[in-house]
């Protein structure tokens, strides 16, 4: 039940962020660009979680903390297409071919600007952190560069 509520919440946030009810077309980018963006996004989310855990983490178990790290990765996977819409707009505004550094900067900006603390407070305050499962451990064990996304680079 907790996972269902978490999933519904993520889908509502997806629709709210995309501001549309239609299908978001896939945007494919070079594998090097994808990897650098994933690393920066997940590291930004993990920095927010680490800071949040320093303040609020005493009342959470180790498994709940691991689940919140899973939430970071799943949130990035869920919203990848919407990030790509924003990134494509920013790259187009540069007026030149993109470089790896541009995608690094944009990934870091996404990781910094998305307020994940809201989700941590929401999940922990309502006792909605789901139990830690094997599929969560499998995703957490992956390096940020290896986290699968729907439209992986070529």
Curated annotation (Swiss-Prot):
Instruction: Note the subunit structure.
Output: Monomer. Homodimer. Molecules associate into dimers and then rapidly dissociate again. Interacts (as a monomer) with the egg vitelline layer protein VERL (via VERL repeats); each VERL chain can bind multiple copies of lysin.
Which processes are annotated in GO (biological process)?
Answer: single fertilization
Q: Where in the cell is it found?
A: Cytoplasmic vesicle, Secretory vesicle, Acrosome lumen
Top-level taxon of the source organism:
Eukaryota
**Alphabetical UniProt keywords:** Cytoplasmic vesicle, Fertilization, Signal
Summed up, the tissue specificity of this protein is: Sperm.
Function in brief:
Creates a 3 um hole in the egg vitelline layer through which the sperm passes. Does not have enzyme activity. Species-specific interaction between the sperm protein lysin and the egg protein VERL exposes a basic surface on lysin that may dissociate the egg vitelline layer via electrostatic repulsion. Plays a role in ensuring species-specific fertilization.
- List the source organism: Haliotis fulgens (Green abalone)
Asked if the record carries the keyword Oxidoreductase, the reply is no
GO CC aspect terms: acrosomal lumen
Cleavable signal peptide: 1-18
Q: Work out whether the entry's keyword set contains ATP-binding.
A: no
Protein name as annotated: Egg-lysin
Q: Which Pfam families match?
A: Egg_lysin
Which CDD domains does the UniProt entry name for this protein?
Answer: Lysin-Sp18
């Amino acid at each position: 039940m907790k996972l269902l509520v978490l999933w519904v919440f993520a889908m509502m946030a997806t629709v709210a962020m995309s501001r549309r009810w239609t299908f978001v077309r896939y945007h494919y980018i070079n594998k090097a660009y994808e990897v650098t963006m994933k690393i920066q996004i997940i590291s930004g989310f993990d920095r927010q979680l680490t800071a949040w855990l320093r303040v609020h983490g005493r009342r959470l178990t180790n498994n709940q903390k691991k689940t919140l790290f899973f939430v970071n990765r799943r949130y990035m996977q869920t919203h990848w297409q919407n990030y790509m819409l924003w990134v494509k707009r920013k790259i187009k505004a540069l007026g030149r071919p993109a470089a790896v550094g541009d995608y690094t900067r944009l990934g870091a900006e996404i990781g910094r600007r998305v307020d994940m603390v809201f989700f941590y407070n929401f999940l922990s305050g309502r006792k909605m952190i789901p139990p830690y499962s094997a599929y969560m451990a499998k995703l957490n064990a992956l390096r940020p560069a290896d986290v699968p996304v729907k439209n992986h680079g070529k």
